[in-house]
Each structure stands twice: as C-alpha cells, then as structure tokens.
C-alpha cells in the first residue's frame, strides 16, 4: 500500500484564535497549548534518552531469532537476550536513512504511550550501533492486521468490533497526551493471537503534537482525510488534530467489515467511489447507497457517516464507536462460521491479494 508523504513543523499558539474557522479544524488556543505541552515533554524525554543510549553492537547483547517485519525505514526482529533468554522485539533503523533526532523521537513517543493495553509496550532501552539505531518492545508474534483481512469479505463481525473498540481506545489515549497518531492502517496494527482477539497499535514515527503544521507532499491514500487534500489554509499547511485519526478509523472499520477500501483517494474529481459516497451521505436515500455499502446495517451507516464526515469540525471523535458496540454492523454474515475457522487456521492469508478494477479491495 502506498504511503503518504508530508512535511510538518511546530505551530505557534498565537497563530490561531479561539474558535478558529472550519478550515483550521476548529482548533482552540487551549487545544494548541496541549499540543505544545506534549512537544516540550517529548523534547525533555529525548534529551534524557540521548544521554542513556547503550552504545554497542546489537549482536553482543541479543541473538536474532527471525524477522517480524520490514518497512521502508527499518526492520523489526524477534530476538532473545543472550544471558537471560528473554524474547523481545527489536526495531532497527539504519543510520544512512534515520537521524538521531528522528530515532529518539519515535523511541520516546512509544515510551510515553506504551502503558495502554492496545499499544505495543516499549522498553526504555535505546541502542546506538555503528550503522544503526535500535530500541526494544514487547514481541507481538501473529503479524499485522492486513494479513487477516479477506479481500472482498473482511472479518467476522465480532472480530471487527473487538478491533475497532481496542483501536479507538488506543487513539483516545494518544489524543489525551496531546498527540495525533496520523498513520492508522492495518499494517500498523499487530495481532496478538490467531483468533484476532487482541490487537495493538505500533509504529509512532508519524505521530505529532496536536497543532503541528502539516502539508501533504505526495498522493493521498484511502486513509488520508479530505481536509489534507484541499489547498492549506495557511502557507505552512494545516494544523493537525484528532479528527484526522477519526477519519482513518472510519476507513479502517469499513475495510474490516467489507474487505474493500471505500475509495482510493478522497478526491471527488479523481475518484468516483468517493463522489458516490458523498452523494449518498448528502441525500440519505437508499437508491444512492454505493454497492459496497449494501450489506452494512443502519447502525454501521450512522457510525461511519459520523467518522467520515468530510468537515473535520462536524466529524465524530473516535470514542463515538462505544455507542455502537454490541449492535449489528452487517445486514447478514455470509459464511461466518467458515470465515471464523479460516481466521483461526490461517491468519497469514488474505490482505496480500488485490482486486483489479472496480472497487479497490483491501
């Protein structure tokens, strides 16, 4: 899945007045101050962490067992402590593509948030080697959520609601710290067991304090909120807010329920699926319902309309899903028993396939 590129920079509180206009997402001085406090706390933590880095080669302390994941900027390994035998996950970032500051930032964000049960716990051990920076987290061994999503089908309803509830709680926790996650997608959700009972959010390299100025520099993806696709209200960009995460959560829930992306890009002029959704959202008429939405229940419609409101000030917060848990989110669950059995027996299949043409599949 293509990633989104962006530039971001801190924002001065004085730049937005209390109750700013909708183009600024309605950020108040109080909200921006919360973001600045989060930024200052992270700076202090980074300064301390820089002084306590362990300078050694990873192989001297840990033995590699197997790879757990690979990304554009680094890799994650399952390792064991050479003396104690403790299993750990080690994220390794090469120095040629990662600055010390970027490493310390991601490391410290993970440390500050990792007490939540739906966020991967980070341990306070940062390592500087000759060619890389590394830090340690709890190991989560059943892969990421994209491998569990069956294209054009999704997940069983109970699994969808469990995942959605846990991720919404994790995002609430992040927002309570004055931060915005900014990178919610199945690849950043780790699965703790074959039945997908528990999930954990990981990878905080894109997390930023609320109010940080953001400018999109690459093509949007389905999870990109539409306000980021519009011309920015200020030359520096758009001050980010938790509504960005609410939009991404809505897209993710749709993917889990259907096995489809609702659209490729949230741009009316280039994506007919997004245009169809906005027409239906505006009219509310059954005849305007886009085809991939046919099997969703009225409760799911209301939930997703709230999370996917194109206006950030009107968009419901991630906590809004609590009102819909326990209600049906699908009209019918075709092959539910078989799908649940497949989920338990083979969590590695699914999301690597891609539909060609028509509605984009997960």
Curated annotation (Swiss-Prot):
SUPFAM superfamilies: Protein kinase-like (PK-like). InterPro entries: Kinase-like_dom_sf, Prot_kinase_dom, Protein_kinase_ATP_BS, Ser/Thr_kinase_AS. Its EC number is 2.7.11.1. Keywords: ATP-binding, Kinase, Nucleotide-binding, Repeat, Serine/threonine-protein kinase, Transferase. One of its GO terms (molecular function) is MAP kinase kinase activity. ATP binds at residues 68-76, 91. It catalyses: L-seryl-[protein] + ATP = O-phospho-L-seryl-[protein] + ADP + H(+); L-threonyl-[protein] + ATP = O-phospho-L-threonyl-[protein] + ADP + H(+). The keyword ATP-binding applies. SMART domains: S_TKc (SM00220). Residues 1-20, 317-362 are annotated as: Disordered. The active site is at 183 (proton acceptor). Residues 1-11, 330-348 have a biased composition (Basic and acidic residues). It comes from the Eukaryota. Disulfide bonds: none annotated. It is an enzyme of class 2 (transferase). The keyword ATP-binding applies. Residues 62-330 form the Protein kinase domain. GO terms for biological process: MAPK cascade. PANTHER family: PROTEIN KINASE DOMAIN-CONTAINING PROTEIN (PTHR24359:SF34), SERINE/THREONINE-PROTEIN KINASE SBK1 (PTHR24359). Belongs to the protein kinase superfamily. Ser/Thr protein kinase family. STKL subfamily. This is Serine/threonine-protein kinase SBK2. It comes from Rattus norvegicus.
